């Protein structure tokens, strides 16, 4: 299958908060989005974990 599970990590505290799926054949770049981090208690940038 082309869809793989990925983990999103907070850029400030490095906590892994979200799990999602993406098609790695169509989207080769790393996913980056602003989401809520409960440890930072604010909306911060989350990037795809290596």
Swiss-Prot record:
* GO annotation, cellular component aspect: cytoplasm; ribonucleoprotein complex; ribosome
InterPro entries cross-referenced by the UniProt entry: Ribosomal_bL33, Ribosomal_bL33_CS, Ribosomal_bL33_sf, Ribosomal_zn-bd
UniProt keyword annotations, A-Z: Ribonucleoprotein, Ribosomal protein
Name the Pfam families for this protein.
Ribosomal_L33
Question: Matching SUPFAM superfamilies, A to Z?
Answer: Zn-binding ribosomal proteins
Q: Which Gene3D superfamilies match?
A: Ribosomal protein L33
Residue spans crossing the bilayer: none
Instruction: Provide a Gene Ontology MF annotation, just one.
Output: structural constituent of ribosome
Q: Quick check: keyword Transmembrane in the entry?
A: no
What does the entry give for GO biological process?
A: translation
Is this entry keyworded Membrane? Answer: no
Q: Which NCBIfam families match?
A: PRK00504.1, PRK00595.1, rpmG_bact
Q: Which family does it belong to?
A: Belongs to the bacterial ribosomal protein bL33 family.
Protein name as it appears in the record: Large ribosomal subunit protein bL33
Supply the source organism for this entry.
Mycoplasma mobile (strain ATCC 43663 / 163K / NCTC 11711) (Mesomycoplasma mobile)
Q: What is the lineage of its organism?
A: Bacteria, Bacillati, Mycoplasmatota, Mycoplasmoidales, Metamycoplasmataceae
């Amino acid at each position: 299958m082309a869809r793989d599970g990925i983990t999103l990590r907070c850029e400030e505290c490095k906590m892994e908060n979200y799990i999602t799926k993406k098609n790695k054949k169509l989207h080769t770049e790393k996913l980056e989005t602003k989401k809520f981090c409960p440890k930072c208690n604010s909306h911060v940038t989350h990037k795809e974990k290596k």
